[in-house]
Amino acid sequence: SDIVLTVDSSLDLDSLSPVSQSTLSMVLRELANNVIKHSQADSCQIRLRRDHGIVLEFEDDGCGFEEVTGQELHSIRERLSLVDGDLEILSQSHPTIIRVYMKEGGKA
């Protein structure tokens, strides 16, 4: 899969707690797998920043979701619930934009 990836990060990843690093890694891995397997995207952008916690925005120019039912990305939502995090689908297609928020450190 030839997807052009752009990363824009103002986070010092080494300064994050082990729980935050692990959760962020799992979320990124799952989102990347979904893009590769399902999206038919040509490009993907990842933005990481702090805004009263850790914010990850994941955007691709693929086919998106046919219908948003609330059950999409269930494993990510489940993992984020353990660290008081949340996931929001800002745009379901053209581009697909997903925003993930989690408190720094988490509670796990």
Give residue spans per PLM region.
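Short beta-strand element(s) in the Bergerat
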Residues: S20, H52-L56, T96
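Conserved short strand/loop->alpha-helix "switch" segment adjacent to the catalytic nucleotide/phosphoryl-transfer site
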Residues: T6-R29
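Glycine-rich G1-box
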Residues: C63-G64
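Acidic ATP/Mg2+-coordinating residue in the GHKL
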Residues: D60
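Conserved ATP-binding N-box helix of the HATPase_c
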Residues: Q21-S43
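C-terminal beta-strand of the catalytic ATP-binding
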Residues: R99-G106
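Short beta-strand/loop element within the Bergerat-fold HATPase_c
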Residues: S43-G53
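ATP phosphate-binding glycine-rich loop and adjacent ATP-lid/helix-beta elements
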Residues: V68-R99
